[in-house]
UniProtKB/Swiss-Prot annotation:
Cited function: May be involved in cell-adhesion. May function as a trans-neural growth-promoting factor in regenerative axon sprouting in the mammalian brain.
Keyword Ligase belongs to the record: no
Gene Ontology cellular component list: plasma membrane; side of membrane
Disulfide feature: C60-C118, C160-C203, C245-C297
Phosphotyrosine, modified sites: Y187
Listed name of the protein: Neuronal growth regulator 1
Domain Ig-like C2-type: residue ranges: 38-134, 139-221, 225-313
UniProt-annotated glycosylation sites, renumbered to this chain: N73, N155, N275, N286, N294, N307
Subcellular locations according to the entry: Cell membrane
Gene that this sequence comes from: NEGR1
Amino acid sequence: MDMMLLVQGACCSNQWLAAVLLSLCCLLPSCLPAGQSVDFPWAAVDNMMVRKGDTAVLRCYLEDGASKGAWLNRSSIIFAGGDKWSVDPRVSISTLNKRDYSLQIQNVDVTDDGPYTCSVQTQHTPRTMQVHLTVQVPPKIYDISSDMTINEGTNVTLTCLATGKPEPSISWRHISPSAKPFENGQYLDIYGITRDQAGEYECSAENDVSFPDVRKVKVVVNFAPTIQEIKSGTMTPGRSGLIRCEGAGVPPPAFEWYKGEKKLFNGQQGIIIQNFSTRSILTVTNVTQEHFGNYTCVAANKLGTTNASLPLNPPSTAQYGITGSADVLFSCWYLVLTLSSFTSIFYLKNAILQ
């Protein structure tokens, strides 16, 4: 009813405008009886895709200088001739020439998505062109799992949610240390996570409208400490020597040293202890007989404790004993050979004299 009154007012002031509005009224759902629609066999339909934030130009041309046009979006009139009915400052009519009656929408948003109709009123019959504007939206990750710290063996689900038009595809990748790709999907399930599966996980949302949106999640996996190696260098009395203990664990383990049942402390009896995240080094600045014995390295964190032992013995004297025995043995054989030689000469001399 309001539209008809508007048309009647337009008739009083401008006959061509009334004609245009009447033709547009046929396109408005509010002007049609329930369950009926109007199909214009002469109407051209076009589809246009524009990225969000860009400028959309919906082309429409007048037949001659006498024809008039109007633009309609769904049930709202945007322009009628040169009169702007929309209050949106982004909307204008492009007039590159006398026949150009294109609708220009700056900084396109998702709310601009939908059908647009250009109606041109000629001297004979109205001509209608329809354009369906599709606003494409670059992918945007709006929700992703926070960085997490969990214990080894726990089930983990990583979440990555994104928006975009077309709807973006979601993919996951374990970028450190393995760079392993996973199947696509918003959720990444890891059952019984292991220490090897710790690191950074990358979520990528992509829909070919723009560059993929990429976010990362850091996963820390706690596990009980292990000692991978305990090893010593040569321990020579009067010189310095060291024992190295290599371990692993998350959180990093705390190291302790024992000699027999006695706990060792840094600076005690010429001992220096240096602890790092994955190793501990025990240095004896001046090795004496009292430093030899059984040493134990202990590594502990909140998930457990482990240890490894190494016997530290004085340098072996076997080398010197073997050398001495050889000298004595050689001397004995030399003596035997000498005595035998003299005996042989003595018997040979007697035989000649006889």
